[in-house]
Amino acid sequence: MAEVSKKRCEHNSDSQCEGCKANDKACEARDKTKETAGSAKDKTKETAGSAKDKTKETAESAKDKTKETAGSAKDKTKETAESAKDKTKETAGSAKDKTKETAESAKDKTKETAGNVRDNVENKDKNEVYENIKEGGSKAWNKTKEVANSMKDGIKDLANKDEQKK
């Protein structure tokens, strides 16, 4: 810069005039400003690039975390469904066994009643025996129907509870 100023300066001496010195200082300040602005521009680009990369990284991390959470929820739902299914099977099996026991009990009771009626046949006339048989059979049949309906309602309740859990 000094040489440029000297070339413009028309002094014969090596020392510059005040105008040339001021001009050189202005040029230096301008160059320094350009340099500082360029440095700031580069720093801004670098910071923006870093922020962009960080944002991208954070988004990828959030995406992976979301996938992981969704997978975990899916697995948990599957486990719960399997558990409910197993519980329903177990309850249905229990109800089936209970129904079978009740039916066998009703069958035994019917046999017992029939045996008692048969024992009384010898002592009573035929019409009375017929009425006793009819009454005993009717009671046993009604009891069997009542137990079957009760079991049927119980199984329906279990199925409804299973559906509600899902």
UniProtKB/Swiss-Prot annotation:
Coiled coil: none annotated. Residues 31-118 are annotated as: 8 X 11 AA approximate tandem repeats of D-K-T-K-E-T-A-G/E-S-A-K. Sequence repeats lie at residues 31-41, 42-52, 53-63, 64-74, 75-85, 86-96, 97-107, 108-118. Residues 1-144 are annotated as: Disordered. Residues 1-13, 21-112, 119-137 have a biased composition (Basic and acidic residues). Keywords: Repeat. Belongs to the LEA type 1 family. PANTHER family: DAUER UP-REGULATED-RELATED, LATE EMBRYOGENESIS ABUNDANT PROTEIN (LEA) FAMILY PROTEIN. This is Uncharacterized protein ECU03_1610.
